[in-house]
Amino acid sequence: MAKMESGSGSDTGLIALLIQINKALHRRTSEELLGMRLKQFLLLGYVGDRGAVSQQELETGLVMDANSVVLLLNETEATGWSVRKRDPADRRRHMVELTEAGKLAVARAEKAREGIEDEVMSDLSAEERKTLRKLLKRVLEGLLRVPAESTSQA
């Protein structure tokens, strides 16, 4: 594994560390998720966990804009992993479901993700992993509660 280049040693800010981790993980997962991009994996996993979901629910749940969700759905439909159907209760709305091929692709990618996570987190104990997961969830929840505009008005 490559050594981290942080510039200022232990003074590296949390945001900088999170960005470095994000870039390294994105590169690693993109290479190893069996031909599936990370965003595709997140979308398919979200749908797989919940069953049929609306495009609007995907926007909210994945913290993505409508155009990005549509482009991503176009990709996952083209690969045969998902399908959009009209909602019988509201014909204006589309519901997204996984195909059988999509369910298989998610299962394969999930196994790869577990292996990557075990390798990446190998220096942490089970308790440290649990703590890290809790802390990162709290940070994410806080970010989702605070509108982006309020953070830029300093």
What is the meaning of each model-derived region?
Residues 50-54:
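Short capping segments at the starts of secondary-structure elements
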Residues 55-56, 67, 74, 94:
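Residues within helix-turn-helix
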Residues 12-16, 36-45, 67:
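Short alpha-helical elements of helix-turn-helix
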Residues 1-6, 127-154:
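C-terminal regulatory/oligomerization modules of transcriptional regulators
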Residues 1-35, 154:
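N-terminal leader segment of winged-helix/HTH proteins
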Residues 19-22, 45-49, 110:
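Short, locally clustered residues in the helix-turn-helix/winged-helix DNA-binding domain
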Residues 59:
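The alpha-helix within a helix-turn-helix
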Residues 26, 74-141:
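Charged, amphipathic alpha-helical coiled-coil/dimerization segments
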